[in-house]
């Protein structure tokens, strides 16, 4: 049963009438451009064919009722006429409440709604299940009440909800690619202007995501530390963000910077340059160059930004040894575990899956999870 069928049938069963709309918003994988988004830089993600799906309908009153199908049909209910506050015991509820609260703060006029939510974006893997949920909820109210919001505004609203209501500092990339993704394309995003450029993916290329299943523990605290180090670097150069610092300017005075901050800055500057070049390599179908750029990105995350772990490095080595110069592989996401992403010819997928299955667990004691994805369409009706 598809997510659409599941949420529609559950909606009718629980609420006693049929849903009028079913909305989907995808998860994402970032092909290259890591920890550049909050430095006003460039990222190159694609939406993937794992998504959050919501069947919904308007209500005549000012109540919002939500059923989380993936959490034993837990219920949340709140009024649009009372201050929307965080839910103490149901973390998933806060993503919904936060999005609705921030839609209100943007002076959108809308009434109540019934929602049934289900999704298949792997959670805790760095594939943006939370952004997918935020964008799906924003799109629900936009569609039900014809709100004058475009995809970028729905994305910004989701980011605000996550930063200010849920209390997690995130850049704009995850929400933006979920809202604006394009089938068979990656999206080069300028995180300062929110300008996007669709980059066609070469035919016959698979997007493979492998979850290391290494339990991420440091990600929250270390993420904030990295962010502070980048801001320190920008202040040193008297610039609003590292986006405004050239590599030449950095190299001229790198020795004057705190050595750790210097490494963090170098990663961001070189990663921005790699990301812009990667978009052009991908468009030309130059998988060899794309692979080189992904390898440089991984080395930079490992050595300069210091956000990889041995398990992730092992996965990258296994995949790289199998695909050679026919594609690329790197860690993707915030770091300290999570996933690697690989671009490779579809014909090589079985060999990569076999190599990882025989070597990764033997070397690390952990069993991986392997996903083959298609670059997919952003949020909308399904």
From Swiss-Prot:
GO terms for cellular component: cytosol. GO terms for biological process: galactose metabolic process. PROSITE patterns: GALACTOKINASE, GHMP_KINASES_ATP. Gene3D superfamilies: 3.30.230.10, GHMP kinase, C-terminal domain. The record marks 28 as: Transition state stabilizer. InterPro entries: Galactokinase, Galactokinase_bac, Galactokinase_CS, GalKase_N, GHMP_kinase_C_dom, GHMP_kinase_C_sf, GHMP_kinase_N_dom, GHMP_knse_ATP-bd_CS. It catalyses: alpha-D-galactose + ATP = alpha-D-galactose 1-phosphate + ADP + H(+). One of its GO terms (molecular function) is galactokinase activity. Keywords: ATP-binding, Carbohydrate metabolism, Cytoplasm, Galactose metabolism, Kinase, Magnesium, Metal-binding, Nucleotide-binding, Transferase. Disulfide bonds: none annotated. Substrate binds at residues 34-37, 223. It is an enzyme of class 2 (transferase). Mg(2+) binds at residues 130, 162. The active site is at residue 174. It is found in: Cytoplasm. Its EC number is 2.7.1.6. It comes from the Bacteria. ATP binds at residues 124-130. NCBIfam families: gal_kin, PRK05101.1. HAMAP family: Galactokinase. Belongs to the GHMP kinase family. GalK subfamily. Catalyzes the transfer of the gamma-phosphate of ATP to D-galactose to form alpha-D-galactose-1-phosphate (Gal-1-P). This is Galactokinase. It comes from Citrobacter koseri (strain ATCC BAA-895 / CDC 4225-83 / SGSC4696).
């Amino acid at each position: 049963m598809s997510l659409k069928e599941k949420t529609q049938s559950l909606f009718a069963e629980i609420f006693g009438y049929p849903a009028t709309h079913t909305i989907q918003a995808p998860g994402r994988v970032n092909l290259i451009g890591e920890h550049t988004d909050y430095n006003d830089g460039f990222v190159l993600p694609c939406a993937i064919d794992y998504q959050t799906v919501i069947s919904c309908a308007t209500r005549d009153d000012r109540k919002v009722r939500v059923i989380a199908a993936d959490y034993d049909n837990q219920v949340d209910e709140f009024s649009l006429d009372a201050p929307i506050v965080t839910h103490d015991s149901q973390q998933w509820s806060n993503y919904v409440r936060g999005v609705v609260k921030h839609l209100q703060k943007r002076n959108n006029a809308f009434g109540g709604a019934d929602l049934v939510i289900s999704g298949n974006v792997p959670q805790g893997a760095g594939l943006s299940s939370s952004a997918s949920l935020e964008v799906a909820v924003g799109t629900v109210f936009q569609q039900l009440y014809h709100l004058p919001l475009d995809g970028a505004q729905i994305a910004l609203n989701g980011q605000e909800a996550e930063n200010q209501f849920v209390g997690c500092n995130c850049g704009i990339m995850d929400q933006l690619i979920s809202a604006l993704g394009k089938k068979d394309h990656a999206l080069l995003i300028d995180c300062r202007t929110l300008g996007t450029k669709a980059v066609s993916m070469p035919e016959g290329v698979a997007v493979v995501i492998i979850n290391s299943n290494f339990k991420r523990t440091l990600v929250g605290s270390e993420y904030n530390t990295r962010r502070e180090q980048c801001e320190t670097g920008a202040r040193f150069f008297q610039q609003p963000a590292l986006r405004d610092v050239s590599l030449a300017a950095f190299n001229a005075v790198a020795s004057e910077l705190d050595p750790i901050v210097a490494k963090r800055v170098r990663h961001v500057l070189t990663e921005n340059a790699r990301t812009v070049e990667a978009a052009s390599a991908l468009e030309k179908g130059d998988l060899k160059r794309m692979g080189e750029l992904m390898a440089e990105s991984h080395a930079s995350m490992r050595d300069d930004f210091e956000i990889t772990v041995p398990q992730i490095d092992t996965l990258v080595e296994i995949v790289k040894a199998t695909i050679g110069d026919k594609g690329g592989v790197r860690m993707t996401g915030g770091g300290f575990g999570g996933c690697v992403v690989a671009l490779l010819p579809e014909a090589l997928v079985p060999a990569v899956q076999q190599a990882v299955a025989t070597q990764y667990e033997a070397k690390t004691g952990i069993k991986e999870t392997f996903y083959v994805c298609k670059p997919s369409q952003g949020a909308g009706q399904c």
